[in-house]
């Protein structure tokens, strides 16, 4: 999972400096809000919305030029409307997914590790990541 800057393919954006003069939509108080507020130039107009649904709606209705959100939220837009011109411009913050297992639960730990290894060796683990997270897996640690 990651938070990113998304916009139409016609906008040339590769870094926070490229947001100069643009209207940027973000969910107020979110991690994305904190990151983009710190990184964006002072003349970028950051518009904060009350929740993700309002933020996504603001982008699709043209209220903002640029969307800052999680990759799964952005993927939901293009899934709902495959004709929507929306591409990732850059990653704001990478947020790897982890699983916690109660200390001492060796059976579950072994099961999870074997499942991951089986899917990785079978070539299916990256496909699962693509399906649910919309991105390739990062390099995995050795088991």
Language model region names:
Residues 1, 9, 29-31, 51-52, ...:
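Beta->alpha turn/N-cap motifs
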Residues 1-9, 75-117, 135-143:
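Periplasmic-binding protein-like
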Residues 7-24:
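Flexible hinge/capping segments at coil-to-helix
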Residues 19, 58-60, 99, 112:
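Hydrophobic residues within well-ordered alpha-helices
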Residues 35-38, 53, 60-61, 65-93:
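A ligand-binding cleft/hinge motif common to bilobed small-molecule-binding domains
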């Amino acid at each position: 999972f990651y938070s990113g800057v998304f916009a139409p393919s016609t906008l040339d954006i590769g870094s926070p400096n490229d947001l100069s003069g643009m209207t940027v939509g973000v969910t107020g108080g979110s991690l994305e809000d904190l990151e983009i507020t710190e990184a964006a130039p002072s003349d970028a107009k950051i518009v904060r919305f009350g929740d993700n649904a309002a933020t996504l709606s603001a982008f699709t209705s043209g209220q903002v030029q640029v969307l800052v959100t999680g990759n799964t939220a952005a993927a939901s837009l293009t899934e709902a409307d495959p004709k929507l011109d929306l591409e990732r411009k850059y990653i704001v913050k990478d947020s790897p997914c982890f699983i916690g297992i109660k200390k001492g639960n060796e059976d579950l730990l072994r099961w999870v590790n074997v499942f991951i290894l089986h899917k990785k060796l079978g070539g299916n683990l990256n496909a699962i990541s693509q399906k649910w997270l919309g991105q390739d897996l990062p390099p995995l640690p050795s088991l």
